[in-house]
Amino acid sequence: GTYDAFGLLNDGLDVQQPFQNFSSFLRWQILKWQNRLDSNDVYILEYASWLMRELSFLEDVLNECRPVFCHGDFDFKNILAEKNIITGLVDWEHAGIFCVEWELRKLSRYCNEKNGFLKSFFIGYYGSLPHNYEVKKRVIKYIEAADILGHLGWCKRSGNVEEYEETKERMKDFLHS
């Protein structure tokens, strides 16, 4: 089926915070994640500001993203496989109506041109590489960069100091790329 809005699903499967386009959803997420972090941290403010500037450049492309039902935490640790065949997904607490680009944000750090993973995914998903493959890669990388802000908050709330520092390093890589 198709969906008219982007957002998270709660345990009653009602859409929370529906958005009519993906850039509005991302803007809301970035502000929510930023507000959960230390508002006096100049680096966090600089990173969130960079995300908002990038969002304004990518807004039209992001709004072409079509909403679909997504797992929401598509990371290797949540994918069950046997003999190179995906047999299941676990950890559905972040499921919602997003887009394929959102779904791939966590896997993008493992995807590169050398291993061909992203190309293989798109060929499997669409039957061929989309005509705007390079644009899709940029969008996925941007969504990953935005999601890192949320992950930083998770690290802080869970007291995971080591992963917090690793995440800040990844943020620096995005900020200076």
Question: Model regions: which residues?
Answer:
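An alpha-helical support segment within catalytic cores of ATP-dependent transferases
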Residues: 1-72, 167, 171-173
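Short, solvent-exposed polar/charged micro-motifs at secondary-structure junctions
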Residues: 16-19, 79, 149-150
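A short, ordered amphipathic alpha-helix with a cationic face
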Residues: 20-24, 93-94, 140-141
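Generic alpha-helical secondary structure signal
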Residues: 21-28, 46, 50-53, 81, ...
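Helix-rich C-terminal or lid/interface subdomains of diverse kinases
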Residues: 27-31, 63, 105-177
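N-terminal hydrophobic alpha-helix used for membrane targeting or insertion
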Residues: 55, 60-62, 80, 92, ...
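Active-site Asp-x-Gly
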Residues: 67-70, 75, 80-130
